[in-house]
């Protein structure tokens, strides 16, 4: 039995609220159980130096946690003077995932930055940031289209992400912190709306896992991601 009595293939309660920031071109607050992540998308009419003059855009992300997003207060990374390796890895994952569904050449020479700030953490913050970040990104692109700054929609599809893993020998969908921290295997899966895999991050913490067990986790992830995508479409009015 899972700690909070969910079925093995049952997601936590999911809620996505759009347009929660009056300044950002796109924004979303995603709540997955007790995990809450605020995602904002900002448009800038410039690109990184390595893309200048190539008539190509860029999508990137930054990720952070509020000091009391976790059980005990953590010092702000700005106060430490440097980002932790975990933070850098997560924000690269978010940016890389979102770029997979954007035609950067159709975006023009501009950047969209997703800022993903964890308000409250109870497992699955990076996957929630990807799923919520997609909403913010889609709305920012919608603004560009409405303003006539884009000739064609650069969004090539939909994507979402979820965590899966083995906890006490059982394959589980959407791990909360108490499961994630004790899982024998932990995976983060990103997929698009064609059912294709964008990213698999998987680690065996307590024991190695077989190909058959990995397939079982992928099946769970596909189920969860389809549910998240249905909510994304509902929120976006698609």
Swiss-Prot record:
- Record's catalysed reaction(s): tRNA(n+1) + phosphate = tRNA(n) + a ribonucleoside 5'-diphosphate
List, alphabetically, the InterPro entries matched.
ExoRNase_PH_dom1, ExoRNase_PH_dom2, ExoRNase_PH_dom2_sf, PNPase/RNase_PH_dom_sf, Ribosomal_Su5_D2-typ_SF, RNase_PH, RNase_PH_bac-type, RNase_PH_CS
The record's section on Gene3D superfamilies has: GHMP Kinase, N-terminal domain
- What are the entry keywords? Nucleotidyltransferase, RNA-binding, rRNA processing, Transferase, tRNA processing, tRNA-binding
Q: Which SUPFAM superfamilies match?
A: Ribonuclease PH domain 2-like, Ribosomal protein S5 domain 2-like
For this chain, the annotated S-S bridges are none
- EC identifiers of the protein: 2.7.7.56
CDD domains xref list: RNase_PH_bact
Look up the record and give one Gene Ontology term from the biological process aspect: rRNA catabolic process
Q: What family classification does the UniProt entry report for this protein?
A: Belongs to the RNase PH family.
What PANTHER family does UniProt report for this protein, alphabetically? EXOSOME COMPLEX COMPONENT (PTHR11953), EXOSOME COMPLEX COMPONENT RRP41 (PTHR11953:SF0)
* Function text: Phosphorolytic 3'-5' exoribonuclease that plays an important role in tRNA 3'-end maturation. Removes nucleotide residues following the 3'-CCA terminus of tRNAs; can also add nucleotides to the ends of RNA molecules by using nucleoside diphosphates as substrates, but this may not be physiologically important. Probably plays a role in initiation of 16S rRNA degradation (leading to ribosome degradation) during starvation.
What protein name does the entry list?
Ribonuclease PH
Supply the source organism for this entry.
Answer: Dichelobacter nodosus (strain VCS1703A)
State which gene encodes it: rph
